[in-house]
Amino acid sequence: MNSRLVLLLAVSVALVSAIAVGNRSSHLKKSKECSSDGHTERCEYTGDLTVKTDSTCNHSTYIMTKVTPPNESPSNGVAHCRTAPCNSEDYADVDCLVAFGADNIAAIEKQ
């Protein structure tokens, strides 16, 4: 009887875990555009991430401008991210690590 209880608990945990995860897909689109005036180079890194989990869909944007050699701007090299439900223009600022994850940020910045 004790082994049946353990088996029942294991099956219950597996079912709850499968329900919690759901069907998830994501698509990352990234780009890097640079320009130079002969003294400095200005590069803009952008990323668009769409994440769908079951019936929920979110779209996040990433933008970072990096000037080299570094300038005095406090925003130089600092990423700004926003997120919104898919098919909405009601974006809210969000922490980039939360919206994109470390792997996607690395992919955007290593172009």
Curated annotation (Swiss-Prot):
Q: Which GO terms describe its cellular component?
A: extracellular region
Q: Where are the transmembrane segments?
A: none
Q: Name where it's found.
A: Secreted
Note whether Cytoplasm occurs among the keywords.
no
Q: Which UniProt keywords apply?
A: Glycoprotein, Secreted, Signal
Where is this protein chiefly located?
secreted
Q: Which InterPro entries match?
A: DUF1505
A Pfam family assignment: DUF1505
Q: Which domain of life is it from?
A: Eukaryota
- Annotated glycan sites: N23, N58
Signal sequence interval, chain numbering: 1-18
- Give the family this protein belongs to, as stated in its UniProt record: Belongs to the UPF0375 family.
Q: What is this protein called?
A: UPF0375 protein ule-4
Q: What is the organism field in this record?
A: Caenorhabditis elegans
Question: Lineage, please?
Answer: Eukaryota, Metazoa, Ecdysozoa, Nematoda, Chromadorea
* Gene (UniProt): ule-4
